Amino acid sequence: MLRFPTCFPSFRVVGEKQLPQEIIFLAWSPKRDLIALANTTGEVLLHRLASFHRVWSFPPNESTGKEVTCLAWRPDGKLLAFALADTKKIILCDVEKPESLHSFSVEAPVSCMHWTEVTVESSVLTSFYNAEDESNLLLPKLPTLPKNYNSTSKIFSEENSDEIIKLLGDVRLNILVLGGSSGFIELYAYGMFKIARVTGIAGTCIALCLSSDLKSLSVVTEVSSGGESEVSYFQLETNLLYSFLPEVTRMARKFTHISALLQYINLSLTCMCEAWEEILMQMDSRLTKFVQEKPTTTSVQDEFMHLLLWGKASAELQTLLMNQLTVKGLKKLGQSIESSYSSIQKLVISHLQSGSESLLYHLSELKGMASWKQKYEPLGLDAAGIEDAITAVGSFILKANELLQVIDSSMKNFKAFFRWLYVAMLRMTEDHVLPELNKMTQKDITFVAEFLTEHFNEAPDLYNRKGKYFNVERVGQYLKDEDDDLVSPPNTEGNQWYDFLQNSTHLKESPLLFPYYPRKSLHFVKRRMENVIDQCLQKPADVIGRSMNQAICIPLYKDARSMDCARRLLKFPFLWNNKTSNLHYLLFTILEDSVYKMCILRRHTDISQSVSNGLIGIKFGSFTSASADKVRRSSYSCLDAQFYDDETVTVILKDSMGREGRDRILVQLSLSLVYNSEDSDEYEFTGSYSTRLDEQGSIIPTRTMHFEKHWRLLESMRAQYVAGNGLRKVSCVLSSNLRHVRVFEMDIDDEWEIDESSDDEEEAGGKPVKIKEEVLSESETEAHQDAAALDPDVVIKVEKLDPELDS
């Protein structure tokens, strides 16, 4: 006979799903009811709590990468960062839609990341946070990029939205910490610009956490040898960041503005290149064929020049014009090329120049900050390096202005050439030519001759490029991302200012004049500018990184399990920073008597301060259900644990004596029970932190916890991993097959659950007690209703759970 409980078990199932791909990482949004998942195919998914509904998917691709290794949310929940091992890239993705807002490359594959919001308050910081950014008042708003280009990123192309502000987020400093192999650790302000590179840590980072007061960085690493891994805990002091927090915040804000502007300039150039390739494609498709098939030995230039001078075309040229181009096609080609030129011109004037001027403004402000040596010299900000960066931006602006002159000249020549050729073709077809088209001044003839000389002059340097038989157009050479010199550099002969500069050694080396590179492309000068800016802003990262010294090293354990890729990706051991009490917590397990015992290591974020009960072990003794109807006593092994909030840890246990399908338990462990002030002296660790902790397992003070509530049997599920979110009061449990997920509301008791107290009857009958609502027959339903009528105090609880999900 079935027995039903007189009390409700904890936690309510609010969603359950079987996913098509294995999940290797999951992270709850810190502000919203969203959970981000990464699977084995390299896809990043965003799901909503309600019914585990998918919001969007960021598919893997060649440019970003296909091997996701970790995820992290920005503290405001508006950006999601994820790392890709194959391309060594970090992608910052908008939570509203699966689009990359920003990306950057790192030197090593990233194995873990953590995004910290700085909570330190001061009057200086408050005034900075509340003050309006002067750049918004002094600089014009950047024009949005045109949407009709296939740019890899759609950032800066949204109307009525300031993408830079969305990317930068709140003024309050937040820092993205990245960890990888060979002790690779880097810190990025606002998730965008590197402000520190840490050295001196051995092994691969498997967990890290920067304290919100910026006083220390906790790192867990593993060093693999002979099939086993030794896992150690490090704590690094970050006093320079803490001591100069207002200066670091101001400097980092400038860095991120500069980083966003460089991205804006890059995307503007990408749009210009696409417009140029449209011109090249139009010209190549019509003229290259003519050159290849032309049986005569005369050049294209000679053919057109003959037509210009004598008004007669050769049979071959006439065939090209009448059959391949046609009058209508020529008119359309001319309009298309003119439109593309106008697009490039507009992008240079409104996008490149405005972006460069904004860049110049922020670098000039940064130079002013660097001049205040008392405040910014300890952070490595170098005024001389910033001056070099300003000079490089000036050179880029000069090259952009040169391109504008070339575009203006080319457009005049293009218009004159197509107008003349259009009239010539009308005469060939004996069509009527309008009087205004017939008028051709000497200046027009000069423009046509210049066009023929510049664009149809055979250039051997172009043989291996597009338009290889002739120099199709002069603008394109400025947009080639190559180190080669320009094929047709601007003619500086007779330029009095240029000659004057070349003959004056004093002016040529003057810091007041920006260097000019007449034989280099715009792309080359842009790359040089980026390198100089990167070099100038790299010094603070080196200086701050060197200041972060290792203060504590605690060897934890040796464990073959750490070699398991999936386990590593799911963040266990787990680090947590309690922002209220300024404590670092580390959750890990030690093997003891064939059971994995959970241990909690805690350290103060201030290295100079100690904390009581620095190391404590947790054993799980008994679980009472149905108002002490029955007590579950067994030997429980900790599979996974994560902090739910500052006061609670969510744990998944495995009952070593339990039957398959009823051997996993979800538990909410309150730290107030672990750190009991009444008997805290009895639980002080008396061993040595310099000796590996698993070798001192017998002397680690251990509490045995007994639970009457805040636990739940996870039936029909081989639960293995958990991710909790105390703000939204939810936890997500993932099975060992990495596909089956179940979501619980943690502060609501479930009203539809059969009591676990009937284990004995279950085993005796050989059938599970779990009643599935969807398969109850009418007779069974009536029988249960009759039973309830006989005893009104008995409540039948039915839950929709699918035991096949975990198969």
Curated annotation (Swiss-Prot):
Main localization of the protein described in the UniProt heading: nucleus
Name a GO CC annotation attached to this entry. anaphase-promoting complex
Keyword Lyase in annotation: no
Tell me where in this chain the PTM Phosphoserine is found.
Answer: S757, S758, S777, S779
Q: What does this protein do?
A: Component of the anaphase promoting complex/cyclosome (APC/C), a cell cycle-regulated E3 ubiquitin ligase that controls progression through mitosis and the G1 phase of the cell cycle. The APC/C complex acts by mediating ubiquitination and subsequent degradation of target proteins: it mainly mediates the formation of 'Lys-11'-linked polyubiquitin chains and, to a lower extent, the formation of 'Lys-48'- and 'Lys-63'-linked polyubiquitin chains. The APC/C complex catalyzes assembly of branched 'Lys-11'-/'Lys-48'-linked branched ubiquitin chains on target proteins.
Q: Which family does it belong to?
A: Belongs to the APC4 family.
Oligomeric state and interaction partners are given as: The mammalian APC/C is composed at least of 14 distinct subunits ANAPC1, ANAPC2, CDC27/APC3, ANAPC4, ANAPC5, CDC16/APC6, ANAPC7, CDC23/APC8, ANAPC10, ANAPC11, CDC26/APC12, ANAPC13, ANAPC15 and ANAPC16 that assemble into a complex of at least 19 chains with a combined molecular mass of around 1.2 MDa; APC/C interacts with FZR1 and FBXO5. In the context of the APC/C complex, directly interacts with UBE2S. Interacts with FBXO43.
The protein here is known as Anaphase-promoting complex subunit 4
Q: What organism is recorded for this protein? A: Mus musculus (Mouse)
Designated gene of the protein? Anapc4
